[in-house]
């Protein structure tokens, strides 16, 4: 998204085209996870239990662990909170901020400030920093805001099922390996922990070896038309107006 705002026109055009395709990928991913959540809720109601593993479903607590993992490693992809490289790329017009043209400022950022979360003296607090150096963090903030929208849709599935559980995004300091939070350990609420505390509790928040083994055990191919794996609900919509039982793929 930042490269789509590039002042180098060939790069900008290419990335804008890629974003159109990426929107489809995001839709498939979000609705796919939603179908897993729907199936879990269906099994919980059918068997009146939170533990749906014996019935071939992935329990909500395990899904939360995977959410914690993927969100935290995705936050690392945006790089350091303060970055001179990002500032230089912005100054050269190679990259921009998300929806740059909609931001009401001078787009030069020489005298602008931005609030960034920092960790000093074993405390997490907000600090005003030069906005030009915090381009990465602004993109990370935009990513977190967008992730919240998807989370609400998954939580709506759970709410509609009448189940007292809600997914939540972990704190941005949780399980980080890049940036200023890489040197500390924090729980999903942002409380700083000692290494001993982290080691003793991390499997409460992240997928354990047993969790990985269980999920992998469910990955059994289902190729018969009209049938679907037991851990995911059927899609709500139709593809090309064909019924769910249609033989979309033929195996020879």
Which residue stretches match the model-derived regions?
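Helix-loop segments that flank and shape redox-cofactor active sites
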Residues: 1-12
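Long, histidine/aromatic-enriched segments associated with O2/redox biology
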Residues: 10, 36-37
């Amino acid at each position: 998204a930042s490269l789509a705002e590039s002042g180098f026109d060939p790069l900008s055009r290419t990335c804008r085209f890629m974003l159109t395709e990426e929107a489809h990928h995001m839709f498939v991913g979000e609705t796919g996870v939603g179908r897993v959540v729907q199936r879990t809720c269906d099994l919980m109601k059918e068997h009146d239990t939170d533990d749906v593993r014996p019935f071939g479903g992935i329990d909500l607590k395990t899904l939360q662990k995977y959410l914690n993992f993927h969100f935290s490693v995705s936050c690392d992809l945006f790089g350091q909170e303060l970055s001179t490289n990002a500032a230089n790329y912005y100054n050269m017009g190679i990259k921009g901020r998300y929806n740059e043209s909609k931001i009401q400022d001078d787009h030069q950022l020489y005298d602008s400030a931005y609030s960034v979360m920092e960790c000093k003296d074993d405390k997490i607090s907000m600090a005003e920093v030069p906005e030009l150096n915090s381009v990465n963090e602004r993109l990370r903030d935009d990513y977190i805001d967008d992730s919240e929208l998807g989370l609400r849709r998954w939580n709506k599935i759970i709410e509609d099922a009448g189940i007292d559980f809600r997914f939540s995004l972990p704190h941005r300091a949780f399980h980080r390996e890049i940036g200023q939070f890489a040197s500390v350990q924090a729980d999903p609420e942002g409380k700083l922990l000692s290494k001993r505390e982290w080691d003793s509790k991390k499997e409460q928040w992240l997928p354990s070896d047993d969790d990985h083994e269980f999920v992998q055990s469910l990955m059994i191919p289902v190729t018969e038309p009209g049938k679907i794996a037991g851990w995911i609900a059927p899609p709500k919509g139709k593809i090309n107006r064909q019924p769910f039982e249609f033989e979309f793929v033929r195996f020879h």
